[in-house]
Curated annotation (Swiss-Prot):
This is Maturase K. Belongs to the intron maturase 2 family. MatK subfamily. The gene is matK. Pfam families: Intron_maturas2, MatK_N. Usually encoded in the trnK tRNA gene intron. Probably assists in splicing its own and other chloroplast group II introns.
Length: 506
């Protein structure tokens, strides 16, 4: 990683901040290939195998540019990889290398700005800020004091050129943008990667990181309006309203185009000190302590703002206004709600005693069992009714590998849903996976489940499925309560950066 930074700084100093020449640097593809294998940005070693050849990548880019001028384009086909070869090499494989390298190159300006910003502000970089669970403690602290919430399904761009135009404000290198346009326009398979679905968008596994970067950057651009309104409508500049990446050009664009004559009126309408915004993937939540009239103003303002200035078509029905007191939020695989908790207090004055009823709001999070059963059913661990079935595709593995896979899946689910107030749903998931594991082992040994468990003992499976529960004792070593009371606690882990996909175990 340090060698990568040194080479990057040297190349940037020689090229005067032009990122296009970085595409032809060998260490970029070595870093991209190794990061793709380990799925981590912070690497110690940037090794790569002999399949990634810088010479072939350079030849492929040269051939692509030649095709642009000759207007004799060819296609990268996933299903017909044998026919699409240049210089005897598979073009689809090296197009993947180019996209991975290009994704790193376009991330460089933002990474350097982030590093410089953190150094100027003297802020401590913490991996906990990237945890998915870090959102829920924030919701617990803030949402219990709010009244209304907007459930927002973020619209998708109607054309990939919009993503390039948004990126143009940050990347001043015209050559890189032209190459990006060529990738997006010349290959129909890439133009169909972003497909609108029921709730948000779907991106193919091909070049997923590259297109997620473009989409997230596009969403981050219009999210800057919340920071802008918050800063302009506050008398005191709060630290919490500062952005990690300052965007001078975006602020100028807002001042000149969006808020020309009606800026003061908009600030008057949206001046709300208790506005909170949370987003994950294609869904966002905007909560406020204001009235329903204020939330309606926000709703139609967002729709018009997306359509007029970011060319994203959004319908008002994709934004729902709900009252937190009688609505459950379906967000990040949790059902969250704010319920009224009554507390009876007995007070005694001299000879008279009376009861005082205190009401307080509490933020609850529950694990929805129905979507999880559907997820397990799709992964062939049970049927649609939740009855466990065997996993035939794993029958060829060793017994230890089968048990380890089932145990790892349960520990991942239990680890992520440890913040659920009630653990009944986790008990059912544990039952499904344990019985599915037993049936898979019995199928392998051509025996019944009862005979197999009688021969090896139930403790063999229990050892793998109870490892996660020991974490609770390590988290609260001084608590002297029973295991049942301890297991009902809500625990948020700050080391979860993604939701594990059960399909990855196929």
């Amino acid at each position: 990683m340090e060698e990568f930074k040194i080479n990057l700084e040297r190349d940037r100093s020689q090229q005067h901040d032009f990122i296009y020449p970085l595409i032809f640097q060998e260490y970029i593809y070595a870093f991209a290939h190794d990061r793709g294998l380990k799925r981590s940005i912070f690497l110690e070693n940037a090794g790569y195998d002999n399949k990634s050849s810088l010479l072939i990548v350079k030849r492929l880019i040269t051939h692509l540019i030649t095709q642009i001028y000759q207007q004799n384009h060819f296609l990268f086909s996933v299903n017909d990889s044998k026919q699409n070869k240049i210089f005897g090499y598979n073009t689809h494989f090296y197009s993947q290398r180019i996209f991975e390298g290009f994704a790193i190159v376009v991330e460089i300006p933002f990474y350097l700005r982030l590093v410089s910003f953190l150094e100027d502000k003297e802020r401590v970089k913490s991996q906990n800020l990237g945890s998915i669970h870090s959102i829920f403690p924030f919701l617990e602290d803030q949402f219990s004091h709010l009244n209304y919430v907007l459930d927002i399904l973020i619209p998708h761009p109607i054309h990939l050129e919009i993503l390039v135009q948004t990126l143009r404000y940050w990347v001043k290198d015209a050559s890189s943008l032209h190459l990006l346009r060529f990738f997006l326009y010349d290959y129909p398979i890439l133009n169909s990667l972003i497909i609108p679905k029921k709730s948000s968008f779907s991106i193919s596994k091909i070049n997923q990181r590259f297109f997620l970067f473009l989409y997230n950057f596009h969403v981050w651009e219009y999210e800057s309006i919340f920071v802008f309104l918050r800063t302009q409508s506050s008398h005191l500049r709060l630290i919490s309203s500062e952005t990690f990446l300052e965007r001078i050009s975006f602020y100028q664009k807002i001042e000149l185009e969006v808020f020309t004559n009606e800026f003061k009126a908009i600030l008057w309408d949206f001046k709300e000190p208790f506005m909170h915004y949370v987003r994950y993937r294609g869904k966002a939540i905007l909560a406020s302590k204001g009235t329903s009239l204020l939330m309606n103003k926000w709703k139609y303002y967002l729709v018009n703002f997306w359509q007029c200035y970011f060319y994203m078509w959004s319908q008002p029905k994709r934004i729902c206004i709900n009252q937190l007191s009688n609505h459950s939020l379906d967000f990040m695989s949790y059902l969250s709600s704010v319920r009224l908790q009554l507390l009876m207090v007995r007070s005694k004055m001299i000879e008279n005693s009376f009861l005082i009823e205190n009401a307080s709001k509490k933020f609850d999070t529950l694990m929805p069992i129905t979507p999880m059963i559907g997820y397990l059913s799709k992964a062939k661990f049970c049927n649609v009714l939740g009855h466990p079935v065997s996993k035939p595709v794993w029958a060829d593995l060793s017994d230890s590998d089968i048990i380890d896979r089932f145990g790892r899946i349960y520990r991942n689910i239990s680890h992520y849903h440890s913040g659920s107030l009630k653990k009944t749903s986790l008990y059912r998931i544990k039952y499904i996976l344990r019985l599915s594991c037993a049936r898979t082992l019995a199928r392998k040994h051509k025996s019944t489940v009862r005979a197999f468990l009688k021969r090896l003992g139930v403790g063999l499976l229990e050892e793998f499925f109870t490892e996660e529960e020991q974490v609770f004792y390590l988290t609260f070593p001084k608590v002297s309560s029973t295991s049942g009371k301890l297991y009902r606690r809500k625990i948020w882990y700050l080391d979860i950066i993604c939701i594990n996909d059960l399909a990855n175990y196929e």
